[in-house]
């Protein structure tokens, strides 16, 4: 079986090389990574009733794997390849993740021909696990009580024991920030015609808020940048790490790449408020998004309600699609309801 798998993989790679030299002249993308970026923005209308400011949201659910993490996954792999640190079919990539970055990494590894090993806390959703495995990645779950710290520790253990292994280190990799300076920031500036006044974004690795913030500030120093973290794990506000449901934010330590001086403030949003807002966005705005997107919206609404921000344009991000959270606290009640539904008789 292993021999057959290797044969099919080699045949696929050979076919791809042949295919790439024989493409007809069209506007069709030659590979799926070219679909990354240039996501649309939309104004929120119903959940913003009573606010004095406008809120526009960049919809990263339109990325190939339905999350913003496709951007840094592609950037970090390309950067490492250019530096000669990794090569397809030879390097095993190992990365700790809370979910979306792992999915994006697995997606890129499958496309480029890398073996991918991911470590992840066991409290993350079943959808994340299945999606990573669907892309061919190996997945190791870690003790949920150890949080992301335990996940990172396990990844480093694997890095030391695995031949030809490499870790892209999203929490300290400058390419994670640079891709948002090069793509996400300019896209926001162009779509708002330079009229953005405030940008607010949850802090996980810190790549998005730092990269976008630096770009917007370079275009207009008066743009205000805000971060946010879970109330239950508010280490950037001097608190202690703790369990929460805003997956992807509040990793329990200050990431190396986050620029705290860039931000006016790091707002705090509770898991309960984030979950409730994500649900509300689905039924009121038709936007089915994840929990961190709910948190971003809560923070944007708080800023929009401040008298000093009346008439201003606030931009935030919906980082991922809500279908990835069906088994999580976000939709677990609806899932149980759906599982218990009984068919009606039809005459």
UniProtKB/Swiss-Prot annotation:
InterPro entries: Cys_synth, Cys_Synth/Cystath_Beta-Synth, CysK, P-phosphate_BS, TrpB-like_PALP, TrpB-like_PALP_sf
A single GO BP: cysteine biosynthetic process from serine
Residues annotated with N6-(pyridoxal phosphate)lysine modification: 69
Predominant subcellular localization, coarse grouping: mitochondrion
Tissues in which the protein is found: Expressed in tubers, buds and leaves.
Induction summary: Slightly down-regulated by ethylene treatment. No effect from wounding.
GO molecular function: cysteine synthase activity; L-3-cyanoalanine synthase activity
Catalytic activity from the UniProt record: O-acetyl-L-serine + hydrogen sulfide = L-cysteine + acetate; hydrogen cyanide + L-cysteine = 3-cyano-L-alanine + hydrogen sulfide + H(+)
Positions annotated to bind pyridoxal 5'-phosphate: 100, 204-208, 292
Keyword Magnesium among record annotations: no
Cell compartments where the protein resides: Mitochondrion
Protein name as it appears in the record: Bifunctional L-3-cyanoalanine synthase/cysteine synthase 2, mitochondrial
One GO cellular component term noted in the UniProt record for this chain: mitochondrion
Known partners and oligomeric status: Homodimer.
PROSITE patterns found in the cross-reference section: CYS_SYNTHASE
Cofactor(s) named in the record: pyridoxal 5'-phosphate
NCBIfam families assigned: cysK, cysKM
Annotated EC: 2.5.1.47, 4.4.1.9
Transit peptide range per the UniProt entry: 1-19
CDD domains reported in the protein's UniProt record: CBS_like
Function, in words: Has very low cyanoalanine synthase and cysteine synthase activities.
Gene: PCAS-2
Family: Belongs to the cysteine synthase/cystathionine beta-synthase family.
């Amino acid at each position: 079986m292993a021999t057959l798998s290797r044969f099919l993989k080699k045949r696929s790679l050979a076919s791809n090389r042949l295919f790439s030299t024989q493409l007809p002249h069209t506007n069709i993308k030659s590979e799926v990574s070219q679909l990354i970026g240039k996501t649309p923005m939309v104004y929120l209308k119903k959940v913003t009733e009573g606010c004095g400011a406008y809120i526009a949201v960049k919809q990263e659910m339109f990325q190939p794997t339905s999350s913003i993490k496709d951007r840094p996954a592609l950037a970090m792999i390309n950067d490492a390849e250019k530096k000669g640190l990794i090569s397809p079919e030879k390097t095993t990539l190992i990365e700790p993740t809370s979910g979306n970055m792992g999915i994006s990494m697995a997606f890129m590894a499958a496309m480029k021909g890398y073996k991918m090993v991911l470590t992840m806390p066991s409290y993350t959703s079943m959808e994340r696990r299945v999606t990573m495995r669907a892309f061919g990645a190996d997945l190791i779950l870690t003790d949920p009580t150890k949080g992301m710290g335990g996940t990172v520790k396990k990844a480093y253990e694997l890095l030391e024991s695995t031949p030809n292994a490499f870790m892209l280190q999203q929490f300290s990799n400058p390419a994670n920030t640079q891709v948002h300076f090069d793509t996400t920031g300019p896209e926001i500036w162009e779509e708002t015609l330079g009229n953005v006044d405030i940008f607010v974004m949850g802090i996980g690795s810190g790549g998005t808020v730092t990269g976008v913030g630096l770009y917007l500030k370079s275009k207009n120093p008066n743009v205000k940048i805000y971060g946010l973290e879970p109330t239950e794990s508010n280490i950037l506000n001097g608190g202690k790490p703790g369990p929460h449901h805003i997956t992807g934010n509040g990793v329990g330590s200050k990431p190396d790449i986050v620029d705290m001086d860039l931000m006016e403030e790091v707002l705090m949003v509770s898991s309960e408020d984030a979950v409730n807002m994500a649900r509300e966005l689905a039924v009121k705005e038709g936007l089915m998004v994840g929990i961190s997107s709910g948190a971003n919206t809560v923070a944007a609404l708080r800023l929009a309600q401040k008298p000093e921000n009346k008439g201003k344009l606030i931009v935030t991000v919906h980082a991922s699609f809500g279908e990835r959270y069906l088994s999580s606290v976000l939709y677990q009640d609806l899932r149980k309801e759906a599982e218990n539904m009984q068919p009606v008789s039809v005459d």
